[in-house]
């Protein structure tokens, strides 16, 4: 495991300073090699696909943090005044557990500084590291308010096999919470019946998960879903939002390990994410499973960049 912060060459964008008005883009407001402060928007990369390999998936997600940053660089800053790039946690070979531990430490430090982090993955093994970071920060504060783990995903990722992989993070979170007496609030929205065995549905029921299948996550159901989400938010003190890009239709997000033949429209995914952000309870978000090795015209990286931009506060609701 190593930590890298060599993304200066990625943060480049056109210069429209000769035009009237605010022409800033994210590349013009990014802070490299600087500590995050209170209220700062921050991105942190998790360059890892060791968990995907362990889960018999297609490697390539380790390339995603750089690809997503490249698509973010030219986006207009709008409401953002400063964006801290906290670098990448890089997984060496199969040292997944060390990388997840390092990610947890970096996430906890950003939260302690008062920053608002979005983590750019990487395989969905990112979730186990992200959650541990949030939990470390809360534990250091003596905060035992319930945490809603909200996963927008075609898969439950509740596999019980070990060692951990991209298919196990929410089972690892469930075990962690059970061992420490924390209530687990796990919701998985966008579940594909084609991508989950009866055993995984049974495990979801066992851990008390709330789930909605992809066919009920279409635009026609948005009002019902937001009302359901409001009930979940009301019961939580904090929210960890994780978006697996394979929840989107393959035409929208072709560059993932397991493309979805049906999927949840981007408009719905984005509206759910913004609804969570507007609640004031979002502490941490991450984007998982972007795989540049299989992307088409940077389509998936562009979608990830848009979602990161919205989550960081790039545009008013």
Curated annotation (Swiss-Prot):
Pathway membership: Amino-acid degradation; L-histidine degradation into L-glutamate; L-glutamate from N-formimidoyl-L-glutamate (hydrolase route): step 1/1
Assigned EC number: 3.5.3.8
Catalytic activity: N-formimidoyl-L-glutamate + H2O = formamide + L-glutamate
SUPFAM superfamilies for the chain: Arginase/deacetylase (SSF52768)
Cofactor details (free text): Binds 2 manganese ions per subunit.
Segment forming the signal sequence: none
Keyword Hydrolase: yes
Family matches, as Pfam families: Arginase (PF00491)
Gene3D superfamilies: Ureohydrolase domain
Protein name per its UniProtKB record: Formimidoylglutamase
Species this chain originates from: Bordetella bronchiseptica (strain ATCC BAA-588 / NCTC 13252 / RB50)
Gene label: hutG
């Amino acid at each position: 495991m190593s930590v890298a912060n060599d993304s200066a060459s990625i943060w480049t964008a056109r210069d429209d300073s000769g035009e009237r008005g605010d022409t800033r883009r994210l590349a013009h407001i990014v802070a490299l090699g600087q500590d995050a402060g209170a209220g700062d928007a921050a991105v942190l990369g998790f360059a890892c696909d060791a968990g995907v390999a362990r889960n018999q998936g297609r490697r390539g997600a380790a390339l995603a943090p750089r690809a997503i940053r490249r698509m973010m660089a030219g986006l207009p800053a709008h409401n953002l005044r400063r964006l801290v790039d906290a670098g990448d946690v890089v997984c060496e070979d199969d040292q997944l557990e060390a990388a997840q531990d390092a990610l947890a430490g970096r996430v906890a430090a950003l939260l302690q500084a008062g920053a608002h982090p979005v983590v750019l993955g990487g395989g969905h093994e990112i979730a186990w590291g992200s959650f541990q970071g949030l939990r470390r920060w809360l534990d250091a504060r003596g905060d035992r308010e319930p945490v809603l783990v909200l996963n927008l995903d075609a898969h439950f990722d509740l596999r019980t096999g070990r060692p951990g992989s991209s298919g196990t993070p929410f089972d690892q979170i469930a075990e962690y919470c059970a061992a420490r007496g924390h209530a687990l609030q796990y919701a998985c929205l966008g579940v594909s019946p084609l991508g989950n065995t009866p055993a995984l549905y049974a495990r979801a029921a066992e851990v008390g998960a709330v789930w909605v299948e992809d066919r009920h996550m279409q635009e026609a159901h948005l009002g019902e879903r937001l009302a359901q989400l409001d009930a979940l938010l009301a019961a939580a003190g904090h929210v960890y939002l994780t978006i697996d890009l394979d929840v989107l239709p393959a035409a929208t997000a072709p560059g993932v390990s397991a493309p979805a033949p049906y999927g949840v429209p981007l408009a719905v995914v984005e509206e759910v994410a913004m609804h969570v952000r507007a609640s004031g309870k979002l502490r941490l978000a991450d984007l998982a499973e972007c795989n540049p090795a299989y992307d088409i015209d940077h389509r998936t990286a562009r979608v990830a960049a848009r979602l990161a931009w919205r989550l960081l506060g790039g545009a008013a609701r």
